[in-house]
């Protein structure tokens, strides 16, 4: 095996292509690619990728299957066992649970975006077994964006930096260590004269690079977009030909945006009306214009409307036909993930049992059913797996786990997913996990979720596995990632676990691929190549449908056109047009509560050295950002009597957490930023330490998933604007 490999870094979710080389001492050196690449510009490597081998070889990595032999869940009494014993016992217990409660009693949380090695086989296993209850943190991070894109224009839309003359950024905190490849794409675009509009309450480095910076109030993005649409329509700046030929609902949209004149939008957002108009005109006239994905609008009370309004902005200025935006499709080189997943094997009565169907159906099988025929017409697949699809609602899943209503969920798998910390209302997630008869965790470290498991199975590292991207449909390009070294210890790939369990559950005939390499060869079989040859090409662009040409097939919506007025949302009983409603817990909507909780909370803002709840183990990455930090503007901190460098409590009506305070002039006055995913792996596990600090430091302790705090269409929690908080000394 050659020592130098071409690898897709999976340290975060941007997936930069890097080179990896095994040195004489056995350590792996990762560095930026040396040749031109269509998806990754030169010098695109961050500190997480540079130090990836320190995580792979960390002394605390789980290298062998472990069984908790304690008398109660969460008791840290671990016994090393074999894979065969673990799989045999898991299968036996799962069979008993299914016999008693039905297959829907299995719930699964999976992280697809950083794993990318099972190619739909987990959903295949669940569908054949009869469980619809798969969920992911993608429910509130890009997966929901993809869902909204689908109902609006059939598929997820990618911004093309190289083909854009104007970029609209929404709270994207790019840097040399955060989405570095896109940061380099941005700098290259600006160098050639591309315009940049930035919407961000914080004065970030990217905001300082902008032609127009709109420091809007947290959570008011939907209102600002509606104001921009108002300007573009009323000033006749839209692409009339595209709107007339390929959009439906324009007149209804035009009527709706009259409710959002610039003076009203300025009052809502806190931005200058003239600057909003200037941004709208720039976006419409500096064509082609694009809006790269940003997580901020995935996590708001008005999330669905904010995402819908972005789709509409792209459409009415012609971005889908001038090269600025690319509508994806199942990759032409690959067997569709949807075919592998076998959604048709899941009975209709089980689809209707998917948790969340009755309360927040949009992202479930029921909500997506209106897109089955259009997807089959355009893409040849009925169940289009576009960046996470057909998901159980996380709140409904954890509630069923905790309360056994509307029915019991008694077995839970966390696959590359720190599920305890990954969703809002961590208290309820803990109750749900404690109420399980079987918890299985597949991961690299003893995470807080793993500490609650019956079995912890050692997962492989991205330097230890070959990968064919993507692991979902709708991405117009793909990359191959070569295996650099064999997995450490007894670590296995995700497909190994899925297939071996499927065999023990009587499903072997549906898993004909004996190992991951056979599965990869099946996935790439349309090319006529096998992995040994295919991996050498490094990247591959998909052949996309002709959506909008003279013989265009249209998009995969019920009308075949971009639905400015959504027939899918109308059918589900939702507002078919975007809107802005003030969240129920702000200083405007609840001034009395704001007297006790005077701060507006913002959860997130990525840090350089970690990704979500990963890479907090002691070492070079943790040393860069050792503590969980809250950010307050110096004036706000002074008014509260809170000096920088002291530990504080941050409290909402839902809970509180302990953080180290740092004064930050970029943080808007009257607001507080809290980090996501912080815990202390160096601490002992178990309930005595709050599962290594997770119950003390993680943002989900203060984030409610009650109905008042959920986006009404998607049923996802508001994390980024519209939650009142207070801060005080410990």
Curated annotation (Swiss-Prot):
Q: What is its EC number?
A: 4.2.1.112
Classify the source by domain of life.
Bacteria
Q: Where is [4Fe-4S] cluster bound in this sequence?
A: 9, 12, 16, 46
A Pfam match: Molybdopterin
Which controlled-vocabulary keywords does the entry list? Answer: 4Fe-4S, Iron, Iron-sulfur, Lyase, Metal-binding, Tungsten
The broad enzyme category this protein falls into is: lyase
Q: Does the keyword Cell membrane apply?
A: no
Q: Which residues form the active site?
A: 13
* pH dependence text: Optimum pH is 6.0-6.5.
Q: Which cofactor does it need?
A: [4Fe-4S] cluster; W-bis(molybdopterin guanine dinucleotide)
Residues holding W-bis(molybdopterin guanine dinucleotide)? 48, 111-114, 141, 172-173, 177-179, 199-202, 218-221, 296, 300, 416-418, 422-423, 442-444, 460, 465, 602-613, 676, 699, 720
Catalysed reactions, semicolon-separated:
acetaldehyde = acetylene + H2O
| Thermal properties | Optimum temperature is 50 degrees Celsius.
Task: Cite the GO molecular-function annotations of the record.
Answer: 4 iron, 4 sulfur cluster binding; acetylene hydratase activity; metal ion binding; molybdopterin cofactor binding; oxidoreductase activity
- Positions the record marks as coiled coil are none
Q: How is the cofactor bound?
A: Binds 1 [4Fe-4S] cluster. Binds 1 W-bis(molybdopterin guanine dinucleotide) (W-bis-MGD) cofactor per subunit.
SUPFAM superfamilies on file: ADC-like (SSF50692), Formate dehydrogenase/DMSO reductase, domains 1-3 (SSF53706)
Q: What does this protein do?
A: Catalyzes the hydration of acetylene to form acetaldehyde. Ethylene cannot act as a substrate.
Another remark in the UniProt entry says: The tungsten center binds a water molecule that is activated by Asp-13 residue, enabling it to attack acetylene bound in a distinct hydrophobic pocket.
Q: How does it assemble?
A: Monomer.
Q: Which family does it belong to?
A: Belongs to the prokaryotic molybdopterin-containing oxidoreductase family.
Which protein, by its recorded name, is this? Acetylene hydratase
């Amino acid at each position: 095996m050659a020592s130098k490999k071409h690898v897709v870094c999976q340290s975060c979710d941007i997936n930069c292509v890097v080179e990896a080389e095994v040195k004489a001492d056995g350590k792996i050196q990762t560095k930026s690619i040396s040749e031109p690449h269509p998806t990754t510009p030169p010098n695109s490597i961050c500190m997480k990728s540079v130090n990836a081998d320190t995580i792979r070889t960390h002394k605390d990595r789980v290298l062998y299957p472990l069984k908790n032999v304690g008398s109660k869940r969460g008791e840290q009494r671990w016994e090393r066992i074999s894979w065969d014993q673990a799989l045999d016992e898991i299968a036996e217990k799962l069979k008993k649970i299914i016999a008693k409660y039905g297959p829907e009693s299995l719930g699964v949380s999976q992280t697809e975006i950083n794993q990318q090695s099972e190619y739909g086989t987990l959903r295949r296993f669940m569908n054949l077994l009869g469980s619809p209850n798969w969920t992911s943190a993608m429910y509130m991070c890009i997966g929901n964006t993809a869902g909204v894109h689908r109902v609006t224009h059939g598929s997820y839309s990618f911004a093309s930096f190289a083909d854009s003359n104007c970029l609209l950024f929404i709270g994207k905190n790019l840097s040399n260590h955060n989405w570095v490849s896109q940061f380099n794409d941005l700098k290259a675009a600006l160098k050639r004269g591309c315009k940049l509009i930035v919407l961000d309450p914080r004065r970030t480095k990217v905001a300082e690079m902008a032609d127009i910076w709109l420091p809007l109030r947290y959570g008011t993005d939907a209102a600002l977009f509606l104001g921009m649409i108002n300007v573009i329509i009323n000033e006749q700046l839209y692409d009339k030909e595209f709107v007339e030929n390929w959009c439906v609902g324009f007149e209804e949209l035009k009527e709706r945006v009259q409710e959002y004149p610039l003076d009203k939008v300025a009052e809502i957002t806190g931005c200058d009306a003239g600057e909003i108009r200037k941004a709208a005109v720039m976006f419409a006239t500096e064509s082609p214009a694009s809006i790269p994905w940003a997580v901020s609008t995935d996590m708001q009370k008005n999330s669905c409307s904010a995402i819908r309004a972005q789709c509409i902005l792209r459409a009415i200025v012609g971005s889908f036909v001038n090269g600025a935006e690319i509508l994806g499709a199942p990759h032409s080189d690959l067997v569709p993930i949807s075919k592998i997943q076998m959604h048709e094997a899941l009975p209709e009565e089980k689809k209707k049992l998917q948790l969340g169907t009755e309360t927040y159906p949009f992202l479930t099988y029921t909500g997506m059913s209106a897109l089955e025929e259009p997807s089959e017409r355009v893409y040849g697949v009925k169940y289009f797996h576009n960046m996470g699809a057909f998901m159980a609602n996380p709140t409904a899943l954890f509630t069923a786990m905790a309360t056994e209503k509307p029915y019991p969920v008694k077995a839970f798998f966390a696959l590359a997913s720190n599920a305890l910390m990954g969703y809002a209302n961590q208290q309820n997630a803990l109750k749900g996990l404690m109420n399980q008869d079987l918890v299985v965790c597949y991961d690299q470290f003893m995470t807080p979720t793993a500490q609650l498991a019956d079995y912890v199975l050692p997962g492989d590292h991205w330097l230890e596995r070959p990968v064919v991207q993507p692991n979902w449909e709708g991405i117009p390009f793909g990359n191959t990632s070569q295996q650099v070294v064999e997995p450490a210890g007894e670590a296995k790939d995700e497909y190994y676990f899925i297939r071996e369990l499927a065999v023990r559950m009587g499903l072997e005939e549906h898993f004909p691929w004996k190992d991951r390499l056979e599965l990869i060869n099946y996935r790439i079989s349309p090319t006529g190549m096998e992995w040994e040859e295919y991996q050498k090409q490094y990247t591959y662009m998909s052949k996309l449908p002709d959506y909008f040409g003279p013989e265009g097939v249209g998009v995969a919506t019920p009308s075949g056109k971009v639905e400015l007025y959504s027939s899918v949302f109308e059918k589900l009983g939702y507002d078919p047009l975007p809107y802005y409603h003030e969240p129920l817990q702000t200083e405007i909507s609840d001034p009395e509560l704001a007297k006790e909780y005077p701060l507006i909370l913002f959860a997130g803002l990525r840090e350089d050295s970690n990704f979500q709840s990963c890479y907090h183990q002691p070492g070079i990455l943790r040393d860069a950002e050792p503590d969980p930090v809250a950010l307050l503007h110096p004036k706000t901190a002074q008014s509260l009597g809170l000096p920088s460098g002291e530990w504080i409590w941050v409290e909402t009506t839902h809970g509180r957490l302990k953080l180290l305070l740092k004064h930050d002039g970029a943080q808007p006055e009257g607001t507080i930023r809290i980090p996501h995913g912080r815990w202390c792996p160096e601490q002992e596990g178990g309930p005595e330490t709050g599962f290594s600090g997770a119950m003390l430091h993680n943002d989900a302790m203060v984030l409610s998933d009650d109905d008042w705090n959920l986006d009404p269409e998607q049923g996802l929690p508001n994390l980024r604007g519209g939650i009142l908080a207070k801060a005080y000394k410990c």
